[in-house]
């Protein structure tokens, strides 16, 4: 991230192939480094900006220069002069908030002269009256009638004062309001008429209610001084999926008989401000905070909806969007309920006030309200939009298309502007129509991966593909992908590391002998096991591995064929069954049988099961996300339920992340997005297996929903040799608890009460989160989950109870599939 203190440090150059747009180049800037270090850097040649946020000041000077720099850029911009003008029009924003956002605004009478098109034709709002003037002179009679009716209207309630002010971007910060008692009709009319003379087109004169200080119920402490008013400033940011998120709330407290503004009061937290005014009861303060959050997020949602209907010219460029918003509220007591009333929208002032609060020497003592930097969600949005800019147009080769559960890949690629080229064994795969280039190549026999990698590299070169990266998210194709990257000179973890992680017994045995340094060593997390290729291997293994144990396919996926075995006869019986039923790819496509059907026996460890999804770049851990799994239906190990974020204590969560990270490094996995399955035992984390690719099932979707981090985008960036900029301590925006549906257990429900259409309709209404994992309802002995159904909530308990009720109503819960038991780990 770079800070440019002068417009002269930046320049715009025409963008080739994009008429009317320009690239922004940086020749000089302040750069920031860990430990608080800053440097003034000169860039030769200049660097290309991938995101621009301008400080749009008022009037001539640098603000105007910054506005011109921000216009019509090829890179994303977080503000523009055109959007700022809209937000600085109090009348327009009040109408927008009242009509679109359902946000309380002051009762307002507006006299507008040649109003902008966005104001025309809007539905009338309660307490918001627009009077369109044909001219600025000769309006005395109309003004008097309208003002008199307004001052007598019920919309003002018990208001004793009104303010008269000008509205329009020209007047922002340049004029003081004029206060009048409500009873002084003549004075109000005279002020309105005087201000009408200053109007230009698309400007207005506002007569608005001035709310007295809310009479807060006193706490147990001494009564506060009379007449204290609270002005609340909320900063809200645009996050993943254009969803508003409250970032921080800061308040000012002052005398109620004087205008309370940003620079004439000290910033403080909402809790401190309300306590100074006599409200210290925790539940009431929490209720006020929730109302402020709802109103602020609704305000930004209304602004984003307005922007969606604007042309690129009206926004100031194709890539111009409002990424953050400051909303100023007055706190009123309407009907005995403390209600925030939106006064105006701004950006810089609210952000500045929050920064001032964070900069106080006592900030570390302020508690949870000061834990997160106000700019954190904004910076995440900047980085996300910057990443999209970097990746747009990148040429990527995808090896293996996968099934219906991976349909999101093609949708996301279109959204990100990626140019995908696909290698796939199925010539009729639906994804063949969704890519730039389709290469049909039979790669089902993975014991020929080295030969196939050379052949594929020749095909890529013959087609003249200029690739930026190559990656796979499909288990069967991971080693082939690493070999192909090696042939093409593209970034990837080494083939040796991929082979080590792909073969489960090899993973465990390698890590068992990895004693460090560094310490704690990966050997602490590995589990004793024995590879099985024959009945003789089984006989030897039952004497080497403590029983009960777990038998599974060496190269398997989706827990197919995984079984708890109690003694030697069960081991022999299960080995015989698997070698008979699952001999090749045709017996069960997509679970690794192209590698053969060798098995392993590993020690069964007691404990709770967890997934850790990691993003690594150059051997450094960039991000980690931990989720919890419910108890499985022994002797099988098909997943039943899951919860995110984890309910583990912070120390245990850190142990899981470090164990997963060390196991990946121990296998040589240095670059990529990986999924590591572990159990937390009394002695610490124990490794189940490493999946050297992005987590499957619902994981990418849940992480995107809760944290705003897209593992797919991170994976393709790493594949292109680009380091993803991810939040080091991402905040979850809620909780998700889900349950798997199996055809063997839910065929009747999935064909009736919980049909695909019913589940999709509930998903579309936001009542559940559906992740479809299979296309058809086909029962079988060796099955994978058909779908995942989840519910969201502000707490794991609420999400769990919602899901349980839903499963009972849909027929997913039952005696043979006790959902309450599967969710019991999440209490």
UniProtKB/Swiss-Prot annotation:
It catalyses: beta-alanine + L-histidine + ATP = carnosine + ADP + phosphate + H(+); 4-aminobutanoate + L-histidine + ATP = L-homocarnosine + ADP + phosphate + H(+). Keywords: ATP-binding, Ligase, Magnesium, Manganese, Metal-binding, Nucleotide-binding. InterPro entries: ATP-grasp, BL00235/CARNS1_N, CARNS1. Its cofactor is Mg(2+); Mn(2+). One of its GO terms (cellular component) is cytosol. Mg(2+) 2 binds at residues 689, 691. Mn(2+) 1 binds at residues 677, 689. One of its GO terms (molecular function) is ATP hydrolysis activity. Homotetramer. This is Carnosine synthase 1. It comes from Homo sapiens (Human). The lineage of its organism: Eukaryota, Metazoa, Chordata, Craniata, Vertebrata. The gene is CARNS1.
